Amino acid sequence: SIEDKEKIASALDNLGVDYIEGGWPGANPTDTEFFQKKHNFKNSILTCFGMTKKSGRSAENDTGLSALMNSNTPAVCLVGKSWDFHVDVALGITNEENLENISESAKHFVKAKKEFMFDAEHFFDGYKANPKYALSCIKAAYDQGARWVILCDTNGGTLPHEVAQIVSEVTKVVPGKNLGIHAHNDTGNAVANSLAAVLSGVRQIQGTINGLGERCGNANLMSLIPTFFLKKDFSSQFEIGIKSKNIKNLTDCSRLLDEILNRKPNQHLPYVGAAAFSHKGGLHVSAVQKDPKTYEHINPEEVGNTRNIVVSDQSG
C-alpha cells in the first residue's frame, strides 16, 4: 500500500541511504500514486524506475518515459538490455536498435537535467557471451551523460572471482566512480559479489532491506552497510553517505519490513537476525560469558541487536 511504501521510504531516509528507488510510475496504481505525493526526504534522493524507450518511437513520444518525466523526481533509473541474446529473444530487435534505445533514452533525461542511471540488465552474462557488445551498451549510456552505469547480475549466477575480473576490465571503459553493482542471490553470493565489485572499482551498490527481491533475492543492505563500518578492509578505504551513528537502527529497520510484510523475521540473517548473537552450546556460552569476542565478530549493540543466551540440554 501507499502507507507501507512511505514507511519503508522513511526508514531508509532516516538510515541515510543515498538513493531510494520508489517504484515504476505508470506500472501500477500504487507506484503512480506514490510519486504523485510530495516527499520531503532529509538524506535520500528519490529515484523513479522504468525501462529504455521502445523501438520505432522517439524518446519524446514514449509513454513510459513520459510517465517517468512527469514523476518530477531528481533522479531517474532506466533498465536496458546488455546481453545480445536477450536483445534478440526477449526484445526481438537488432543489436543496433537496442543501442539507439539506450542512447536516446539517456540523452532525453540528461537533457532534462535529471541525474540519470542506467541499469545494464544481464550485464555479466552479456559480457561473458559477447564482451564487445555488452561494453558498447554501457558506453552508449555513459557517453550521453549517465551519472551511474549499474552492472547487473540479473540471473544471479556470476561468482565473486568473475565479478572482480569483469569489473576490472569494465573500469578501463567507464570510470569506477560512475559504476554500480546490482547483484542477485541465486548462488548465495549477492553480498560477496557486491563487495568484490567495490574492491574492483565500483562506487554504487544497489540492494534491498533483508535482501528482498525476485527468486532468491537481492544484495542485503542489512549485511552490506555494517560491513563498510565494522570491517577494517572496507572502513579504512571507503566512505558511505550513511552516518556511523545510524547503523544502530539497522535491526529495527530490518524488522519493520517483516512487520509490514506480515511475515516471520529470518532469525539467521547476518548482523540483524535474532540468532546472529544467540549462544546455546556449552563451550560457546562459557566462553562468551568470559569475553563475548570469543564467539562474536562484533558487538551486537553496534547494529541495534542483542546477545541471547539460550538455556538447553546443550548448555552444560
Task: Give the role of each language-model region.
Residues 6, 135, 188-191, 218:
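Glycine-rich phosphate-binding loop at the start of an alpha helix
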